[in-house]
């Protein structure tokens, strides 16, 4: 980015998102949807391997208003209207092995340590990641930044949105994650799920 004003604004946004008050990896997290029994996640690569694991237990970060979370606020959790079950997920950050994705380098390094070749690109090998980590957390900063540089991806003048561009580089961006969230690949010690009252709409 050549414009000094754009660079200055970008640096200010990144600094704000790195502030301790913006930390999104907090306990408790929120899980929406019925939980009948907590079992060990069976993490697999999807039929079309990519940025998302299959079989993970997903949680979202609660928001300051106390009634919503990052999944609900993003509009991605369409089940919440018909399945109001909501749980708080308590964990010990000092015990759980959680890799944080705050930057493009964080995401690229995770893939480089656990690569799976798919159609000429390296994508995350989720069973391999699950052997090393209990969870992967995507922060707000990571949601914005964990994508391959535009210079690494062939230009497609027919694509206006940039999504396909993000997915066609030497490694995929995190666009499929959609929002700030945590993918639990294993259940660590000191992990507890408690039912909470449904969110009032």
Model-predicted segments: where are they?
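Active-site and NAD+-binding cores of ADP-ribose-processing enzymes
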Residues: 1-39, 76-201
